UniProtKB/Swiss-Prot annotation:
Function, as annotated: Participates in chromosomal partition during cell division. May act via the formation of a condensin-like complex containing Smc and ScpA that pull DNA away from mid-cell into both cell halves.
Family listed: Belongs to the ScpB family.
GO biological process: cell division; chromosome separation; DNA replication
Keywords in alphabetical order: Cell cycle, Cell division, Chromosome partition, Cytoplasm
Protein name, entry field: Segregation and condensation protein B
The keyword Cell division is annotated on this UniProt entry: yes
InterPro entries: ScpB_csome_segregation, WH-like_DNA-bd_sf, WH_DNA-bd_sf
Oligomer and partners: Homodimer. Homodimerization may be required to stabilize the binding of ScpA to the Smc head domains. Component of a cohesin-like complex composed of ScpA, ScpB and the Smc homodimer, in which ScpA and ScpB bind to the head domain of Smc. The presence of the three proteins is required for the association of the complex with DNA.
Subcellular localization: Cytoplasm
Length: 197
């Protein structure tokens, strides 16, 4: 393996943290780490064992040859309280992501980032934690990226009964360049937000 098991576990932890809620496939880990499958299996088993302890708040989840870090279900009541704690208003970037998701759902993080032109992972995590967005499925294709959509809480917070009440987009919105499309989403959505404040 080259490195000792402690170093490998730390590297895997960093990779899974950076991958966020999309996780990493076994193939991706093998490619990045440049090791053989038996070695990876040993490392992942050790990582999983370490997270099983009572002193850890996260656990390693494996599904369909994909690994991801997740909070333990035992701590759900505390996470729920965190979501319910009043927080400051949404940033412009958060409103922009909400606008894109609300009009284009279901949509992947990569598609959101393509429209915005910047990374959006932290904003997505924050909006999911606030229960404004949620996972609505998985995209077809390599990696099976998470598809995001809005939640009933989103509708409630923005004074909407259904998504049909969102301001309509101009018919030529699909023909605009990506940056103009992002600006249009934000402009329309921000107006709705201002109207209900």
């Amino acid at each position: 393996m080259g490195l000792d098991i402690v170093n490998w576990k730390a590297i895997v932890e960093a990779l899974l943290y950076a991958a966020g809620d999309e996780g990493l496939t076994k193939k991706q880990l093998l490619t990045v780490l440049e090791i053989e499958e038996p070695e990876l299996n040993t490392i992942m088993a050790d990582v999983a064992d370490e997270y099983r302890g009572d002193t850890r708040g996260i656990e390693l989840i494996e599904y369909a040859d994909t690994y991801m870090l997740s909070t333990k279900k035992d701590f759900a009541p505390y996470l729920k309280k965190l979501i319910e704690v009043p927080s400051k208003g949404l940033s412009q970037a958060s409103l922009e992501v909400l606008a894109i998701v609300s009009y284009k759902q279901p949509i992947t993080r990569a598609e959101i980032e393509e429209i915005r032109g910047v990374k959006s992972e932290r904003i997505l995590h924050s909006l999911v934690a606030k229960a404004l967005l949620c996972e609505v499925g998985r995209a077809d294709g390599p990696g099976r990226a998470i598809l995001y959509g809005t939640t009933p809480t989103f509708l409630e917070q923005f004074g909407l009964k259904t998504l049909d009440e969102l301001p309509p987009l101009p018919e030529n919105a699909e023909e605009d360049v990506l940056q103009e499309e992002a600006d249009l989403f934000f402009e329309n959505f921000n107006q709705t937000f201002e109207d209900i404040k």
